């Protein structure tokens, strides 16, 4: 599980600027997945060899009404679920009543909090930040998010205390030649239960589907402190295969006796996706493909998880409406053509039984053993069918390929100038490998490594005989001139 860092503060203090810097994003597009939008408030961030989830909670002033009040409530929920809170204030504007109001709320929660004075570029940061000590939340960290000043030190201080509680936070670099590590990883995955996360936006029928799969009312309504943080982990067995169901809808808040409203948490959903081997994304057929569905798909793809899509509430729809929905899915979900899509009714059970065939297929594809000889052969076939382009007048040469990891499958290609391959050719290779290996239900990651020249940096030392020959040749050419 990855830790969660929440960015908190009133409007216009620079939360979005810091968010973009941490997640390396500037717009709503996800690289290499045309047509997919990214939620600007939630993202995956990497700092040095650590990764974490960052949440931009939006501006909170304390006097919100209507829909703004609902958004503020979601922000407060994100704060409750965070492991570290970065409380941003504007060093140029000074301490305002809204800052004091947010500080009053933060004092009541038991979280690690850092007060971050932003926009200190071009001013005396120490003197301008001094008044924020009156908030009573400890030392003040000074940054200029727009230019990156002070951000590295801030992250060092914020993430260091979390290392013992979140061992998954560390990114482990696998050496390309260590294929044994990839194979041992594959064997471990084969022996463990399949972790299946059921995710989707509120009220699409996640709990109904979970109960239908389990055959009993297991996902109950909780009303206890502490249950808002964790997803529900349910062990089960199907077709002689062990599973762990990660249910993100297991925690709900009862408003009325007859009405249970899901307490939706994107943070909890992101953590479930990171934890899972296969993600079952539930979409409401009656609402079509929404931006929130696309955001969740973006998180799944960025995490490299296997994917199965279940379009729920399919029963009762007319043939014309069903055809319209299928056309919309073809148009908007073309970038996940590797994933199986099922049309189901969780309430009545139709189509639910077929889901696990696709879940197993996706997991087997993600953990399939692929040897170096086969991968290199497929790479050479792809190279023969469609030659790599010229780069600076030279043809890119791919030499060999091997497995670099599993879940998702990682293919490492070595060669000359491979880093300069255009994205279109990389997509061609990805599709070629997928078709040749019959991989379904999981994304493929291809890494490119430049071939090292063994003579690079070495001086050519001539023997005495070679030196005499070289002198004779040089004198010969001089005489000819």
From Swiss-Prot:
Family according to the record: Belongs to the TRAFAC class TrmE-Era-EngA-EngB-Septin-like GTPase superfamily. EngA (Der) GTPase family.
In terms of InterPro entries, this protein maps to:
AAA+_ATPase (IPR003593), G_ENGA (IPR031166), GTP-bd (IPR006073), GTPase_Der (IPR016484), KH_dom-like (IPR032859), KH_dom-like_a/b (IPR015946), P-loop_NTPase (IPR027417), Small_GTP-bd (IPR005225)
Q: Name one Pfam family in it.
A: MMR_HSR1
What is the purpose of this protein?
A: GTPase that plays an essential role in the late steps of ribosome biogenesis.
State the protein's name: GTPase Der
Segments crossing the lipid bilayer: none
Keyword check for Repeat: yes
Gene Ontology MF terms in the entry? ATP hydrolysis activity; GTP binding; ribosome binding
Note whether GTP-binding occurs among the keywords.
Answer: yes
> Which GO biological-process labels does this protein carry?
ribosome biogenesis
Q: Please give the subunit comment from the record.
A: Associates with the 50S ribosomal subunit.
Q: Which gene encodes it?
A: der1
Residue ranges constituting the KH-like domain according to the UniProt record: 368-452
PROSITE patterns, sorted: G_ENGA
Signal peptide residue numbers: none
Q: What residues does GTP 1 bind to?
A: 9-16, 56-60, 118-121
Q: Name the keywords, alphabetized.
A: GTP-binding, Nucleotide-binding, Repeat, Ribosome biogenesis
Q: Which organism is it from?
A: Alteromonas mediterranea (strain DSM 17117 / CIP 110805 / LMG 28347 / Deep ecotype)
Cite the EngA-type G domain residue spans from the record.
3-166, 194-367
Q: Which domain of life is it from?
A: Bacteria
| Positions annotated to bind GTP 2 | 200-207, 247-251, 312-315
* NCBIfam families membership: GTPase_EngA, small_GTP
């Amino acid at each position: 599980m990855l830790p969660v860092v929440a960015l908190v503060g009133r409007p216009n203090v620079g939360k979005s600027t810091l968010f973009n810097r941490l997640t390396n994003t500037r717009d709503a597009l996800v690289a290499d997945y045309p047509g997919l939008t990214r939620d600007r408030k939630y993202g995956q961030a990497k700092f040095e060899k650590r990764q974490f989830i960052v949440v931009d909670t939006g501006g909170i002033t304390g006097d919100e009404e209507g829909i703004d009040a609902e958004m503020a409530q979601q922000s407060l929920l994100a704060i409750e679920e965070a492991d570290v809170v970065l409380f941003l204030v504007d060093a140029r504007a000074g301490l305002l009543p809204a800052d004091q109001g947010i500080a009053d709320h933060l004092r009541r929660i038991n979280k690690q909090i850092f007060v971050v004075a932003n926009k200190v570029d071009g001013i005396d940061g120490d003197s301008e930040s001094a008044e924020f000590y009156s908030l009573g939340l400890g030392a003040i960290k000074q940054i200029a998010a727009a230019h990156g000043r002070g951000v590295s030190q801030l992250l060092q201080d914020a993430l260091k205390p979390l290392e013992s509680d979140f061992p998954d936070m560390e990114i482990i670099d696998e050496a390309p030649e260590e294929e044994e590590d990839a194979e041992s990883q594959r064997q471990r995955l084969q022996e463990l239960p399949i972790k299946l996360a059921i995710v989707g936006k509120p009220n699409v029928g996640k709990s109904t589907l979970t109960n239908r799969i389990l055959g009993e009312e297991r996902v109950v309504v909780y009303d206890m402190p502490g249950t808002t943080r964790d997803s529900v982990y349910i062990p089960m067995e199907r077709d002689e295969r062990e599973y762990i169901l990660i249910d993100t809808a297991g925690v709900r808040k009862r408003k009325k006796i007859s009405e249970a409203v899901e307490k939706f948490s994107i943070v909890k959903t992101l953590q479930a996706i990171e934890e899972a081997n296969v993600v079952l994304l539930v979409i409401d057929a009656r609402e079509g493909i929404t931006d929130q569905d696309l955001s969740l798909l973006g998180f799944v793809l960025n995490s490299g998880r296997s994917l199965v899509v279940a379009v729920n509430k399919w029963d009762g729809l007319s043939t014309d409406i069903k055809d319209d929905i299928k056309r919309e899915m073809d148009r908007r979900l073309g970038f996940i053509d590797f994933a199986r899509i099922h049309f189901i009714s969780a309430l009545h059970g139709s189509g639910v039984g077929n889901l696990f065939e696709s879940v197993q297929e996706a997991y087997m594809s993600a953990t399939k053993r692929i040897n170096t000889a086969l991968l290199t052969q497929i790479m050479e076939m792809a190279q023969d069918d469609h030659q790599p382009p010229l780069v600076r007048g030279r043809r890119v040469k791919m030499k060999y390929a091997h497995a670099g990891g599993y879940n998702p499958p990682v293919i490492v290609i070595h060669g000359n100038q491979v880093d300069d391959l255009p994205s279109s050719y990389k997509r061609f290779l990805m599709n070629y490998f997928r078709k040749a290996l019959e991989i379904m239900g999981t994304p493929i990651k291809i890494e490119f490594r430049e071939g090292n020249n063994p003579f690079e940096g070495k001086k050519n030392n001539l023997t005495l005989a070679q030196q005499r020959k070289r002198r004779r040749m040089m004198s010969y050419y001089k005489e000819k001139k």
